[in-house]
Amino acid sequence: MIRRLAIADRGMLLDFFEQHWGGPMMVTRGQITHADQVEGFVWEQAGEWLGLITFVMRADDHGDGGCASCEVTSLDSMAERRGIGSALLDAVIAEARLRSAARLWLITTNDNLHALRFYQRRGWRLVALYPEAVSAARQIKPGIPLIGFDQIPIRDELELAFDL
């Protein structure tokens, strides 16, 4: 069911990012990550993608000379409460360990309470708040909505980390 993204998946990956993320790029902490730059795993059943996780291995930890890290750039489950998101996250954790990463990290927005619950239940911790960072991201990607989940204004980025 879980398999690594392949080169042949790029077209479907771009379509997925367009549909679920408003375009083929993600903007976090002012940095652009294009869909064609990510690695990932997909949960596929009968040719249909039920889940997708993407990540980028980073040479150092936020430029401070630390150990290599793995940034989770997206996680989507189209069939909630079936363990798909957890299984995909476990696949990335295993991959990061194989590549000797010291930690995983990700950025989410202040409105994404579901993600905050999901990751913290799995041992991730909040490590940074970037106030008004989404305003800067909108300069790069204007399609980022002003209002998010539960009618919460989207303003801030939050960084979560998981030490390996």
Locations of regions flagged by a protein language model:
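Conserved active-site tyrosine of GNAT-family acetyltransferases
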Residues: 119, 124
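Conserved GNAT acetyl-CoA-binding A-motif
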Residues: 96-108
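Conserved beta-strand-loop-alpha-helix junction that forms the acyl-donor binding cleft
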Residues: 106-115, 127-138
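Short hydrophobic/aromatic beta-strand or adjacent loop that forms the aromatic wall/cage
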Residues: 38-40, 154-159
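Acyl-donor-binding surface of acyltransferase catalytic domains
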Residues: 143-146, 158-164
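Acetyl-CoA-dependent GNAT
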Residues: 4-80, 86-90, 95, 99, ...
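Short, P/G- and charge-enriched loop/turn segments at secondary-structure junctions
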Residues: 28-30, 143-151
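A generic structural micro-feature
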Residues: 64-67, 150-156
